[in-house]
Structures are given as C-alpha cells and as structure tokens.
Amino acid sequence: MSFRSVIISNPASLSVKNNNLIINNGEEFKIPTEDISVLVIESVAVKFTSRLLSDLSENSVATIICDEKHLPISTVLPLNVHYKTYKVLKMQFEQSVAYSKRIWQGITKQKIYNQGECLSILNLQGGEFLKKLSASVESGDKGNKEAIGAKYYFKALFGDKFTRGDGDVINSALNYGYTIARSAVARTLVMYGFNTTLGVHHCNEYNAFNLADDFMEPLRPIVDLWVYENIAEEDELTREHRVELVNLLNYQCIIDGKNHSILNAIDKMVSSYTTACSKKDFRLLKLPEIKPLEYHFYE
C-alpha cells in the first residue's frame, strides 16, 4: 500500500521515468510512484506535463495543486481504476433512503465522539458532554446534533471569539488540513470504484466530492487536535506547518480496535463501507477514532 505524502514547495520540474517520480531542482531526486498516496504541488513555479498527471493517476496518486498563496485549489484523481466500477455504481444507486440515513447516523456519531475525545485529550471542558451527545444521534441526524455539537465544540476548543470561516491562521490551517484529508478520502473511494458525486448525506449538485465530504467528517477532529497543539499561538501558516499537515496522514488513529495510520484507516473505512453496501447492513461500517497525536511507524 502507498504511504508517502510528498509536498513540492520550491521551483522544480517533475517527470516520471521507470515508475519513479523524478524531482529536479538542480539536484535530482527519485521516489517510486507506487509509494506515493498524495502529491501536493505548492509552488506555482513547478513545471510538469499532462503525461505526469496521467502516470500519477494510473498509480492512484491524488495530486493537489495550490495557488500562489499555497492554498489548495484543485485535486486530480484517477478514474475507472476499479475493475467493477459499474457494479459499485449500481450499488450506490440502489441504496435506500433509510440505509443512507443509518450510515450518516454512524458517521455523525463518530465525528461528535471524536470531537469530545479531542477536548478530553487536551484537558479542555466539554469532552464528556459531546460523547453523551454523540450517543443521542438519531437516524439521519434528525435532531441536527452535528450542528449543536459543532457550535459547542469550536467555542470550547478555540474560545468564544472564534468563528469558523474567518481568514485567521487557525482557519487557514484547518482548511488546509481538511483539504488534505478530503483528497485522501476521495482517492480511496475512487480506488474502490465509488462515484464521489453521489453522497450519503451531502448532495450539492455543484460538488464532485459529496461522498468524500461525508466520510472525511470523523477525521476532522484529528486536524483540529493538531492545529490546537501547533497553530493556536502562531501568526502565520508556515511551510513547515503545511508539511506537517500533509504528514498527518501518517499519524495514528484507532479503527476496529487497532492502531493504524490515518491513510490505512481511510482504506479500512472505505473497504468496510463496500462490505456494508453489498450486504445492505449499515452495522458493518467501521470508522476511525482519534487518539493523542503519535506518528505511525510502518513495519
């Protein structure tokens, strides 16, 4: 399984040769493409061709392209990499409303629980309240517990004056981290043959990644935890911060009772969703649980 997250921050030319990504910035570096899960091109002075994007897509690499402010503006994903794409698409279309609501219930419960765990890890007030709130989530989140939890959570985490959507450094870091997580989830969904436009809950007709937006929800608190511990007292989002946010994919979380990297956990989550859909049993879905930040060492 691919495990590397690569970020290109300085002017360079990129190419692929003999199944290696070649990075040339005066010196030449080689990385096996089969090892790469996500490539982030931060500098607008990086040169590459459509052949590069084609080769990366063939190796199921999610390529994120940033603007002059180093903010992600585009994600390039592979198409038709699964050998039973039609079967999976048919399975998506045949999902009942009741089943989709149950899947969303599970996702929302885990997201709110992880928000509570984030507060508990940081010794902030409100962790137990959110965990109890997560247990009360109904099918389809009929009582809108997600919104109730989010309003409480962000105030407890970043203070009463914090507003999600402001242009401050905390929001910039959150948005950057969420985009990386979203791209990793979208990449894995595509690898398993899912059409990311067809969401379980998100259904924006202008959004090509509704399903990725559904399944990234339990991962958001991992980004929040990192941002609180590393950004809360900073004035700007530096290159070092962005590199670490990309590297979050190699930190640990818990899924199915075992420690895994976030990348591996995403794969297990999507794999379990495939099984849950094929057997029409929402209880088979496995979702990640956060833990104190710790790098995952691959064996």
Task: Report each predicted region and the residues it spans.
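Glycine/small-residue-rich interface belts in oligomeric ring/scaffold proteins
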Residues: 35-84
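Active-site helix-to-loop segments that bind/position phosphate- or nucleotide-bearing substrates
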Residues: 2-5, 11-12, 26, 58, ...
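N-terminal ordered "arm"
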Residues: 8-50, 54
